[in-house]
Regions:
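Cys/His-rich zinc-coordinating "finger" modules and their low-complexity flanking regions
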Residues: 1-201
Length: 201
């Protein structure tokens, strides 16, 4: 019987990693992005991995890029700066890369949920949205979560920023649950954006 509560991982060969839940943000030592919630950790070394970084697949396919075959890499190819095609943030650690097209996806961005719900508003993941983001006010090329009524539009990276800015309200229960006075109250249980036990990088 497989024990998912404790694993061995090539990126941390000296100790096993234990599955834990944290209400405090952590930096993933795999993809180098911030996460919150369930993750694998080594308490001895202060080493953490998102669920999606720990349980990676050698090869994946993504519906937004039907012609691509993404391969898991420990670090970005070449020595040139690269960015994630999902969130548009820099890629500095674990990544899924398509050698044919040159696209890159953080492991957590590759596994983002297609929808987020909080009881009031449902947001759906889109590859391209022409409207500006409800949080930053900018239009962008990154993936976005958008409500069916098109009233709310949030970049994937902005969703993660909102999560980190409000982690105490969301996970500790201090204060109101509303993410922002401008945005809907969305209860993110991301496994980024590691986005996601439902999203957290």
């Amino acid at each position: 019987m497989t024990n998912f509560n404790q694993i061995s991982h090539f990126s941390h060969p000296n100790h096993t990693l234990k599955l834990e839940y944290s209400e405090i943000p952590f930096k993933c030592d795999g993809c180098k992005e911030v996460g919150i919630g369930s993750h694998y950790t080594c308490a001895i070394c202060d080493f953490d991995l998102h669920m999606h970084c720990a349980n990676y697949s050698p090869t994946i396919f993504h519906p937004y890029y039907p012609k691509c075959t993404f391969q898991f890499l420990q670090r970005p190819p070449d020595n040139t700066p690269r960015y994630c095609n999902g969130c548009k943030k820099d890629v500095t650690g674990f990544v899924y890369h398509c050698y044919k097209c040159g696209y890159d996806l953080h492991p957590c961005c590759a596994k983002l949920p297609t929808s987020l719900h909080d009881g009031e508003v449902s947001l759906y993941l889109y590859r391209k949205v022409s409207a500006p983001c409800h949080k930053c006010g900018r239009k962008g090329r990154s993936w976005s979560y958008r409500s069916k009524c098109q009233k709310y539009n949030l970049h994937v990276a902005c969703v993660m920023e909102m999560l980190m800015e409000n982690w105490q309200d969301i996970y500790v229960g201090q204060g109101e649950r509303r993410i922002s006075s401008k945005a809907p109250s969305v209860s993110f249980s991301f496994e980024a954006p590691s986005v996601f036990e439902s999203i957290s990088h």
